[in-house]
Amino acid sequence: MDEKGILVAISGGSCSGKTTVAEMIYQLLSKKLKVAIICQDNYYKSYKNKPLLKRKTINFDHPDAFDWKLLRSHIEDLLNGSIVNVPLYDYINYTRAKKTAKIGPIDVVILEGLMPWFDEKLSRLSKLKIFIETNGEERLIRRIERDWQRGRNIDSIIKQWREIVAPMYEIFVEKMKRNADLILPWSQRREVSTSVLDVAIEHLFHKTVEKNN
């Protein structure tokens, strides 16, 4: 595949700060290149044929919850210079929304989520893999604040954390560090300047384009 763009992947536990880092990089890069952020959550399987109560019990922190085939296809299309209609996730109804977001053509795709390079093909396509490391206590506090704003009650948030989120982090998400190019502790995010990442990603993009021309 002659890539016209590059993929940067950002992994980390729930509420570790992945989106924040992705947006910081976007703000710098988008001044020079066409950049898009894609959230891996948008590629949860639809589960639209299951009733809402059943959808609420699904383990969304397990790799099997994602539509890897669709995600791979869309990433490959974007790296090829095409336009894709990215699905959007409805956090209230635990399924895909009816609307989609049109993205492309782009130079840099930032894919952020729990395990964006769990899939071998996506791992190979990723030019830079960044893992955001944040302690569990901080992540839980952020999770409670976030899900409370989404209308969840405290008991259900903590129950889900204990039974699903924390165990899945240990089994799957934390292992993403093994193949990460950069492990970024949240507490040191300001020492590891995003401007450095900006320069590195821009260099990777131009290097990839030159190689394929």
Swiss-Prot record:
Its EC number is 2.7.1.48. SUPFAM superfamilies: P-loop containing nucleoside triphosphate hydrolases. ATP binds at residues 12-19. One of its GO terms (biological process) is CTP salvage. GO terms for molecular function: ATP binding; cytidine kinase activity; uridine kinase activity. It is found in: Cytoplasm. This is Uridine kinase. Pathway: Pyrimidine metabolism; CTP biosynthesis via salvage pathway; CTP from cytidine: step 1/3; Pyrimidine metabolism; UMP biosynthesis via salvage pathway; UMP from uridine: step 1/1. It comes from Mycoplasma genitalium (strain ATCC 33530 / DSM 19775 / NCTC 10195 / G37). It catalyses: uridine + ATP = UMP + ADP + H(+); cytidine + ATP = CMP + ADP + H(+). Keywords: ATP-binding, Cytoplasm, Kinase, Nucleotide-binding, Transferase. Belongs to the uridine kinase family. Pfam families: PRK. InterPro entries: P-loop_NTPase, PRK/URK, Uridine_kinase, Uridine_kinase-like. One of its GO terms (cellular component) is cytoplasm.
